[in-house]
Structure formats: C-alpha cells, structure tokens
Amino acid sequence: MSLRVLGSGTWPSAPKMFLLLTALQVLAIAMTQSQEDENKIIGGHTCTRSSQPWQAALLAGPRRRFLCGGALLSGQWVITAAHCGRPILQVALGKHNLRRWEATQQVLRVVRQVTHPNYNSRTHDNDLMLLQLQQPARIGRAVRPIEVTQACASPGTSCRVSGWGTISSPIARYPASLQCVNINISPDEVCQKAYPRTITPGMVCAGVPQGGKDSCQGDSGGPLVCRGQLQGLVSWGMERCALPGYPGVYTNLCKYRSWIEETMRDK
C-alpha cells in the first residue's frame, strides 16, 4: 500500500502518500522532481485549461515546493488530504502549467490547518484537512469553488480525478500541465477484495476493472469529482498504480459534509 504523496529527500521504504514537489518562484512555478516523486494521473489526458477551476496546488516550506493537490470549497477555504499537512503551506489557484507563470494564477498563504480530529496516519482513515487562506481568492473563470456532495456515489458512477502526479508507474514521469482521467466508483466488494480489512466507511474506491487508469503519487489530496460535485480526495493505493483489480482509494467526502460545514463556519 502506498500513500499518494510526494515528499522531499530520499524515498520512504514503506507506504508513500501522493505528493508532488515543485518550486514556486515569485512570478512563476517551476516544477522540481525529488527522489520521492512517484505518482501522477495514469492513463489520462491533459485537462482543458480552466476546466477544473477548483483545482489547488499545495506548496510547502519557505521554498514553496509543490506537495499535493486540493480543491477550493469557498473563497477562503481549501480541502486536501490530512497526510498533506506541513508546518508552512501556501496554495496556488488558477494553475494549469506548473512550469510557467500564468496570468490566472493566485498564490495565497495558509493561516490555519484543520485536520479531521479522528485522522489516523497508520490506517489512513479520516484522511482530510481544511486549509483557511489568509485572504479570499478572486473568483473568476479560472478559479471557482466546488460543492461537497451530500450523497454517497453508487457503484459505476462516472467521475473525474485531476492532478500533477506521475503519468507512469512504477517509473515516474511528471507532466507540466494538469492531467485528468475518467474513472468509476468501484463496488464495495471489489474494494474490500483488493484491500482486505483495510477499507472503512470513510473511504471509497474508484478506477476501472481492466486497470490502466488511476491517480498516483503526486496526486494526493486532489479532487475526485462526480456529477459536478466533490465526491472524494486522492488518499492511497498500491505502490504501483493502475493495476487491474486494485482501484485507487479516496477519502469518502459524503461522510464528512457536516464536519466540513461546521469547521468552515467556525472561523
């Protein structure tokens, strides 16, 4: 099992989260690939520019290295995976190509990180976190919030996941531009068979039975969108992505809408 995060330094020997690291300069985001960079969208395509206006890129530390994906929920709140938490975070919105300055981009400082109180870093249960921005984002064509779903998705529901993670696995290749892939919500029995005694109500699996399409390392915290609403967040999966019979595992946001709303109200 592997978390779909990218970190800095050497590769961890155990499960990894999907995090992608890049350096954001004052006016341009230049992507850097560390030894831990291993996952991106597999089997997808370059997203149409501004087609995922809620997509966020999390930037960690004073060097503003790209860490994870996320989704804009309101002018001042972003949601991501809990395992993406770091002491210093900024959020880049309105991005398409991480290697270029873009007129649509906005980079905002995170002033508050609220991890779900029951997050378990060992089991990856309750893997979500809310980020409060220092100032509201400017909403427009390239930057727009998405609503968290009220209802849990039924098996077979068509969804889309997006991110800047690796486009190949196990050998990593990272794209400059945001990638999208269409996948389906997996039946519970498929999810349980792939990951026995591991899946909780706070998790949902998504992929395609034949494999070849998946989120991957570098995509952690990114949005799984079904029928125009935010259904999940990239959380974890197999070390090698897009294997037949092993869908990706996502935070099941239909189980957390009340907590999300209460947290965003409690400023």
Curated annotation (Swiss-Prot):
Record SMART domains: Tryp_SPc (SM00020)
Keywords: Autocatalytic cleavage, Disulfide bond, Hydrolase, Protease, Secreted, Serine protease, Signal, Zymogen
Signal peptide residue numbers: 1-34
Induction field: Up-regulated by steroid hormone.
Cell compartment(s), UniProt: Secreted, Extracellular space
GO MF entry, a single one: serine-type endopeptidase activity
pH dependence: Optimum pH is 8.0.
Coiled coil: none
GO cellular component, one term: extracellular space
Matches recorded under PROSITE patterns: TRYPSIN_DOM, TRYPSIN_HIS, TRYPSIN_SER
Protein name: Kallikrein-14
Organism, scientific name: Homo sapiens (Human)
Species classification: Eukaryota, Metazoa, Chordata, Craniata, Vertebrata
Name of the gene this protein is made from: KLK14
